[in-house]
Amino acid sequence: MKGIIKDAVILFIITLIAGVCLGAVHEITLEPIAQAQEKARTATYQEVYPEAVSFGENAELTQAIAASAQEIASQGFGNVTVDSVQEALDASGNVIGYLITSTSTEGYGGSIQIAVGLTGEGTLTGVGFLSISETAGLGMNAQKPEFKDQFSGKTAQTFEVTKTGAMADNQINAISGATITSKAVTGAVNAAVYFYEDCIAQ
């Protein structure tokens, strides 16, 4: 009986030590992971809006996100949300445009989160990806310039995906074999553009 109790105590101590060690490792790795994610996010922001020196929050615009959520959901862009909005600033701290992040849950592989840059005049400066888990060689091609750069330089408008070749300024050529991904990304862009037009450009 004493042997059984002794073995149980030893097992408990080993389990306790292992749990403490795992918890410590988790805590140690949390900060580097967060730093890496923040670095990647900053790099995407800079890619989307290269003219900006920094980005800053605007409390009024942040509050407008929740207020506009229902209206954006009713626009037919799919299951999309606007997640955040930041002002794009020049070296003097002047606002030169905006960076809006949005998410579509209708990607083939799950949610897709993007960042959209817009100038003060309503021209798209670019589209970048913050999170995407689509099929390699198909939906992941959304990250390639051939697809995402179709939005750059265009004025704020509602975009649509076409599989027959873009004939109008608001048409976006679908990725071959990845129409679902193409529509999800375009829906997220449309949500960001709508927020800009409804809450910023007014």
Label each PLM-derived region with a short phrase.
Residues 2-202:
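Flexible, solvent-exposed loop/hinge segments and secondary-structure transition points
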